[in-house]
């Protein structure tokens, strides 16, 4: 197979050269992706390959939603390229979340959605996370507590509050996703919420809310008065 590398393009057209001259902000999504991919495929240079991948996946958001194996199966990818792309997207996601966490305290369910909605809408398993808050409702930490099917029998209260106790948090917000895409709370979700609210009172750690995320939407159990009676 003949691979066309970035350095085989005219020097003024090379994404790396343009980045050095004009800065990363001047590059298109395809040019940035081409730098990560490094080489194209037979008959397709690396910039064309990057453009094709973005078109097929629905842009950078589409690439973010693909898991590692799905990335590997895209035409022209393979394990090495998929690993580079996945790592770069994860770095970007972490930086974005860190910036949001530092910018403002949590005041509403919408603030929680700003932090986690996009990422958790597309998880293919249930994840339960806790957002740890200080006395001014600023985010201390976001912790993944469970991955897998959640019910009142397998959710251990001690695990949910473990990091909050260690960090001396004033409050927590519980967030989990429904892989089905439907965020309507189940009876199990409501029962889990009741148990956590009760435990929080004993530990003097307020459970501010429990959000369920699904397919770009979310439900606040506190707003609906479910489990916070």
From Swiss-Prot:
Protein name: UPF0758 protein Caur_3603
Keywords noted in UniProt: Hydrolase, Metal-binding, Metalloprotease, Protease, Zinc
Binding-site residues, Zn(2+): 176, 178, 189
Limits of the MPN domain: 105-227
UniProt family annotation: Belongs to the UPF0758 family.
Intervals of motif JAMM motif: 176-189
Single biological process term from Gene Ontology: proteolysis
Record organism: Chloroflexus aurantiacus (strain ATCC 29366 / DSM 635 / J-10-fl)
Phylogenetic placement of the source organism: Bacteria, Bacillati, Chloroflexota, Chloroflexia, Chloroflexales
GO MF entry, a single one: metallopeptidase activity
